Amino acid sequence: ANGDFLEGHAVFDGQPLTIVGTTGHAPIGVRLALAQARVVLETVGAHPGRPIVLLIDTQGQQLRRHDELLGINRAMAHLGTCIDLARRRGHRVIGLVYDQALSGGFITSGLIADACYALPEAEIRVMRIPAMSRITKLPESLLNALSESNPVFAPGVGNYVAMGGVRGLWQGDLQAALRDALAHSPREDMRALDGAERGGRKLAAEVVQRVLAAG
């Protein structure tokens, strides 16, 4: 580790892997977004087809004027584009939320991987309920009530599994879990279908198919 930035290589079952991510609940600013993108691009250029494991522990995007002025939106979009490029070039990209995943720092990493997994004790949410209340103008009491029955409004790793955003939890033998993920994670986006099957997002897959059919 280099501060809050993780970068390295490993050999797993005789296969080299690229490891990249963050630690310490790192806020993702321009520096960290570009550093992760660099590792992904270097892997694509120098090691065709090598799997990439994204280790995710972030409090979300860096809320700082310095990063806003430097174009944090473009830096984070660049990171997401690099991960997408790696997938299109045949790299298996696996995300693992091992601690905390919030907001844009999660959207531009784990949610762009071939599949994202999590440890059972991980914390995942895109927006806190007080922030949802400010944005939607709905009272917190209503949002809290909705979160009891609707995974879309509720934080927690179990709700993201139900919605399909997290493909599954890694419990027990983590080596076996990684082995299975590298071998069986889908190349196509299965999140909407997983959400429908699990009851967390009942209409997303149907709406996607209607849009595709209309095109």
Residue ranges and their predicted role:
Residues 4-7, 137-143, 150-161, 168-215:
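N-terminal organellar transit peptides
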Residues 15-20, 36-63:
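A structural preference for short, pocket-lining loop segments at secondary-structure junctions
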Residues 40, 44-47, 83, 87, ...:
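Structural signal for hydrophobic packing residues in well-ordered secondary-structure cores
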Residues 33-41, 76, 110:
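Short, hydrophobic/amphipathic alpha-helical packing segments
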Residues 9-34:
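STAS-typified acidic loop motif
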Residues 60, 64-175:
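Conserved catalytic cores of soluble enzyme domains
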